[in-house]
Design a protein with these regions (language model features):
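Membrane-helix interface segments
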Residues: 16-17, 109-111, 115, 205-210
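Helix-loop-helix units of permease transmembrane domains in multi-pass membrane transporters
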Residues: 91-124
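Hydrophobic core positions of alpha-helical segments in small-molecule transporters
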Residues: 20-24, 115-116, 128, 212-213, ...
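Central hydrophobic cores of alpha-helical transmembrane segments
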Residues: 21-26, 206-220
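Membrane-interfacial segments
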Residues: 39-44, 93-96, 100, 139, ...
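Aromatic- and glycine-rich beta-strand/loop motifs that create alpha-glucan
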Residues: 1-26
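Junction motif at the cytosolic side of a transmembrane helix
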Residues: 198, 202, 261-283
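Secretory targeting signals
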Residues: 27-93, 119-197, 201, 237-261
Length: 283
């Protein structure tokens, strides 16, 4: 078991697709930090050295990509569910096509192989989700101090409202808020990638395997954003995976139970597929 897990982790974190996904994610992280820092430093502070600015408004936490509402930050979370499946969620489909799993089944049991594969996919997806956000915050901290945000900034700088998940932490212990959303994104992306991996038991084409679930997420987001307008007089809730990965809310405020439910559904569906997959012939 340990050897199989070590092999799968090595394959997941040392393949070129993991590097591609991570570089793209880090480019978003650095780009969003630069787009916030450069105008603030060279267009606001340098030309007006004697002007007072409310200290909390220039906190690195207010500018963190997870609470940033600029177009590039929103685009990052829009493509994140696709980025996190690129590193290794396709591996089972590829190994089945190449005949590798037949050899793997003779060396380790199917259960051990499936478990090691799932853990590798889960961890690589979580890393792709979290590392760019850490890089973004560290870069911003090089330009702006870590002031504790003020609730007065909610309407102007950081749209984290009192109903938002973890809002108390954001305005009291911002590092704990960062850790909370890192954990949420790690679990959501890991569970999502594991679900896509499980779909490879019935979807053999790797391009369809990675793109079809993503298109389904876009469809769910479209329905979620429009159905409450169509119904009228109904308080909306956030079902979109894209929006639940993002700390700040755009249309509907996140609900912690819905986020937990999404993680549970992805894990449950992946478990069903793996149980059924264990009964199938390797060929």
């Amino acid at each position: 078991m340990i050897t199989c897990l070590r092999i799968e982790l090595s394959k997941a974190f040392r393949n070129g697709w993991f590097a591609v996904a991570l570089v793209i994610g880090c480019a978003f992280g650095l780009g969003c930090a630069a787009l916030y820092a450069i105008p603030s430093v060279f267009s606001t502070f340098v030309p007006n050295p004697d002007k007072f600015y409310h200290p909390t408004s220039q906190s690195c936490f207010n500018a963190w990509i997870s609470v940033d509402t600029t177009s590039w930050a929103l685009l990052f979370y829009q493509v994140l569910p696709l980025l996190c499946v690129i590193p290794y969620a396709w591996s089972f489909a590829s190994e089945r096509k190449d005949g590798y799993i037949s050899h793997a089944y003779t060396r380790v049991g199917r259960g051990e192989y499936f478990f090691a594969k799932y853990v590798a996919v889960f961890l690589s997806a979580g890393a792709v989700a979290v590392l760019p956000q850490i890089l973004n915050l560290v870069t911003l901290a090089c330009f702006f101090p870590g002031y504790v945000p003020s609730i007065q900034d909610a309407n102007y700088y950081a749209p984290v409202f009192w109903q938002s998940v973890g809002s108390f932490l954001f305005y009291n212990l911002p590092l704990a808020y960062v850790a909370l959303y890192m954990l949420i994104d790690f679990l959501l992306c890991g569970a999502w990638a594991g679900f896509v991996l499980a779909l490879s038991l019935v979807v053999h084409n790797r391009v369809i395997l990675l793109t079809a679930p993503y298109l389904a997420l876009l469809a769910i987001q479209f329905v979620n954003e429009n159905i409450f307008f169509a119904i009228g007089k109904v308080r909306g809730f956030q079902l979109s995976l894209f929006e639940n990965l993002h700390g700040s809310c755009s249309m509907y405020i996140q609900n912690g139970w819905i986020i937990v439910g999404e993680i549970a559904v992805f894990l449950f569906m992946a478990g069903l597929f793996w149980v059924s997959g264990g009964k199938r012939d390797a060929l």
